[in-house]
Amino acid sequence: ENARPCGCGRKGCLEAYCSATGVARTAREMLAKTDRPSILRELDPEKITSLDVSIAANKGDKLANDIYEFTGHMLGEACGDFAAFSSPEAFIFFGGMTKAGDLLMKPIMEGYNNHVLSIFKGKAKFLFSSLEGSSAAVLGASAIGWDL
């Protein structure tokens, strides 16, 4: 009921929280809910991007780091749910959010390890793709076609 609306028309989708636009929205929500100091307060809230949050976090901004903690933990928990029925060898992330590096990866792994069934702990690798986003999508589709 209180979940975020997603661009697909549903509510509560992972995309609404763990995408670049999701990070920007989390920033706006956290700025509105608290009076904690943050570099992000110097910006127009409606124009904040995930890049702004990343820059602030890299400058030691605690609120910006908390935004990535929230996002990464949520994505890590989703990976834990996915592992329960698929037992993947690896989770490979690509796209603009991966430029956040450890700001995102550390909380992803924490969220995963705190949420995943114990039999899956330490089994999956967590990697950032070195491919550009559009290349990854085309190559993934090609690989599926090749197997058919």
Language-model features, listed with the residues they occupy:
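ATP-binding/phosphotransfer module of carbohydrate and carboxylate kinases, centering on a glycine-rich
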Residues: 2-148
